[in-house]
Amino acid sequence: MNHVLAKSLISVVAAVSTLGLAQAQSAAENPATPAPKHEKQAPKVERNLKVFDNLDFDVFSNQKWDRLKESHSDDIVVTWPDGHETKGLGHHTEDLKAMFVFAPDITIKEHPIRFGSGTWTSVTGVMTGTFTKPMPIGDGKTIPPTGKRFAIGMATIGHWQGKTMDHEWLFWDNQDFMKQLGLSN
């Protein structure tokens, strides 16, 4: 009887794995070696890290765009993974909104690595979502959704002036992102 039960369990695990439900799509979600526990930082840095946690986990993930001013200055400079820069909170907000057009379920749920010094903070995270809506590419053209789920390891470095960031650097692997979206090999 135990042999039959074991075979049944193995079959269920194999079936679930085939559906992609049991395994992370990328090592970013399920790293072989998790990050060490967070080390307490100076009070000012801890305050900025808490603001940043709230930014990603609540404001960004729940698209509460009117609350971006809690963490970003009006004249924020944002350097994106491809190296281009945007200036101003309004421009940055529109760029963030554009990500949710093709993947309305994007979330960031944790910052496994978070630290800083003085007016600087740095966090890592995993941005997840599903490509379920057409992706606008300009001139009224779109890329049809692939239905692919993505889990992108990302990092953000922030420079703080007072209680908000005046410059934010975003890092993730765009090639890996495109592969996970099903748009490249």
Q: Where are the language model's segments positioned?
A:
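C-terminal and inter-domain tail/linker signature
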Residues: 23-185
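Bacterial N-terminal signal peptides
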Residues: 9-20
